[in-house]
């Protein structure tokens, strides 16, 4: 029996994607080999690789100006790879500080140039409860790029409208909310996302890059770290994480089969309404620190009156078959991660549990 998985990542995968992998694990398409045993330059794997790119391109409406890349190293590598490619000594880039992960990206940029904090919504206690307003941004037109983190898993905030950054390329870490809904890819110079939330398993990092933007990248860095190297070689410059990309393909095929990103957005908004509804019904018991306009659809955070009640909530939920609810060590409390593989019914079950928990423990 499978549990209801609210882990923040690696997160649950859609059951049809896992079942497809199970059925094809030993003998992939009659080849007598597992997909993970095939050469990354062989016909069998090439079909998977190209299908994954094609599915994502269609689902998201990626224009010809942009290219899909499959890399490794996670978002943490991208924190360094972005400035490595686009910052030069003496140059600056603007960073929008909205949480721990944007702080980490900012720190990596210091090795290559002069990152600048264009805005920070950190409170005196170093917590974040909102994303900034457009009028709070202090952007420089000479910046090499503007970097933001679209969703903040630890503190539960999310950009619901991306900022206007003028003619400066916008770079976004979308690791924790990529594909929760559709959006205009053409607005971005580069998007990166670790796969292990909404897209697949850990081990592969998705990049969607503006071809003209990455063409301006530095050439005095190792080839393996140049975006152009991977673009020119269809993400096959070195051996890619073939099994992870195969599972990404399965997840993308599932998204297409259920109705695409419009259907996912509908489900995700319904899930958020259910869970925040349970929180807001009991505001003295479930204390949600995030300002309403900045509430994340993917990661809902709240605290109970005491740490002991937090622990009881997690333990009781586990007995009911729900796991992954303990908050990040930085924030404490409870964190509910509702990525695409979490169903509306899963969240309805948790919301009912929350109402019952208040009655018995409140």
UniProtKB/Swiss-Prot annotation:
Source taxon at top rank: Bacteria
Catalysis performed (reactions): O-phospho-L-serine + 2-oxoglutarate = 3-phosphooxypyruvate + L-glutamate; 4-(phosphooxy)-L-threonine + 2-oxoglutarate = (R)-3-hydroxy-2-oxo-4-phosphooxybutanoate + L-glutamate
Major subcellular location class: cytoplasm
Annotated positions binding pyridoxal 5'-phosphate: 75-76, 101, 153, 173, 196, 238-239
EC numbers: 2.6.1.52
Sites of N6-(pyridoxal phosphate)lysine modification: 197
InterPro entries: Aminotrans_V_dom (IPR000192), Aminotrans_V_PyrdxlP_BS (IPR020578), Pser_aminoTfrase (IPR022278), PyrdxlP-dep_Trfase (IPR015424), PyrdxlP-dep_Trfase_major (IPR015421), PyrdxlP-dep_Trfase_small (IPR015422)
Name under which the protein is recorded: Phosphoserine aminotransferase
Organism: Myxococcus xanthus (strain DK1622)
